[in-house]
Amino acid sequence: TDRSRGLGDVYKRQALRNDLLRRLLRGLQDAFDEKSTSKNEPLKIYADNKESYFQMRCMKTGREGSSQKEGYVILLKNITEFKELDSAKTTFISTISHELKTPISAILMSLQLLEDCRVGSLNEEQKELAQSIQDNSDRLLSITSELLNMTQVESGKLQLKPRITKPIELIEYAIKANRIQAEKFNIQIEVQYPEEKMGKLFVDSEKIAWVLTNLLSNAIRYSAENGRIIIGARQTKDNWIEMFVRDFGKGIDPRYHQSIFEHYFRVPGTKVQGSGLGLSISKDFVEAHGGTLTVDSELGKGSCFTLRLKA
């Protein structure tokens, strides 16, 4: 009736003015939207002068034997304590990572002084020791960088600074960053880039370059000596740009194709050193741009990682 419709409109307007009800309605809409990326995010409610976090679960209700729905039931589980613990963990990791960078930088500066011929030449044993210090310091810097990137993502403070970038510039940066590592194992890096004009990207070039650098570094570490790696880009008919890194190493068991993008996961039996963070951070960075990062791999046939971004 007109009266019931009028009352419904009044209630709807009141609900939209109420912050809590508005958030519940938005959460209800996201819960049944397959394309929504925020359906698993906790619901934040401010009451009694404090913030509380809830996990929201929605269910449709209706008469038995009828396909017609009568309404929804919303269940809220208070996860504030877990959220606070997770936040404390993220803050701790971020603080420790920042604190580690200073002594590592001091070690590297001291190492440069030791290797300066004006101070005095090193014998072969001392050169090996200096190289070991360099390698381990670089590894520590890489780990602290990954931890800082992870805390940015987990705390929701990931800030993108997009600018117009050519895909080839990102590829060249990744190759330059990994050149010494590739030469060390005598690995040839081939570039596949179409001669025809390719679209440009509007992305945070530092973060996407970091992703490509990480993928190329992984490919080198998991390749045999005297091997080869292909890095390149292509544009699809639906105007997406795909950048890929292909190696011809051991490959990844299909059982682990999803797990390798999780924090700290490492394929069982892996002997190559790593933190288990690089791929998960890479995936977060790419998805923050509205893109995807996927893997195509079989045991004994190598791996191909592809990131898709809108041109």
Predicted feature locations:
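Single conserved hydrophobic/aromatic residue that forms the stacking wall/gate
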Residues: 1-11
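PAS-family sensory/regulatory modules and their coupling/dimerization elements
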Residues: 12-81
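Primarily the dimerization/phosphotransfer
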Residues: 73, 79-119
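Conserved catalytic submotifs in the C-terminal HATPase_c
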Residues: 127, 161-166, 183, 188-199
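Short alpha-helical segment of the dimerization/phosphotransfer core of two-component systems
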Residues: 135-140
